[in-house]
Each structure stands twice: as structure tokens, then as C-alpha cells.
Amino acid sequence: MSNSMISDMKDKKVLIVGMGKSGKAAAQAMVKLGADVCVQDSKKEEEVDPQLRVFLKDRNIKCYWNDQPKDMSVFDMLILSPG
């Protein structure tokens, strides 16, 4: 990722779709870059690994479990995670 892309992530609203290993890694990276991160996964909240839920909660990351945002136009970037 170029330096300009990195600096451009500050305060951008990012939705990460899929919270497997690569989704968690993407969330970590986007938080470090200063993005406003939201995540979405088809699992119900109780099916999600408790450690992952703590990780997301501690970083004030909005989660859409078994749901999706009503208005996708609010996001500056979507990251599709394969798993």
C-alpha cells in the first residue's frame, strides 16, 4: 500500500465483509491506519468467537451479525474477506 493510500485511510468509513482470519487482519490493519471500521458477517453474534467479539468491542467497531447495513452509501470502502 502506498504512503498516500495509508494517509488517505484516516477517518474513512470502511466496511469489512466476512470476519474469518483475513477479515480480522483487515480490521486490525484499518484500525491502525485510523479508519472508522464496521464489520459484517453472516453468523449470528452467539456463533462468533468470543475473543473476536472482545477484540471488536474494545476497538468500538460496529458489527452487523447476520445482518447488513441499511445504507451502503455511507462507506468509503468495502473490503471483501474470503475467510
Give the ranges of each region predicted by the language model.
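N-terminal leader/targeting and accessory segments in enzymes
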Residues: 1-83
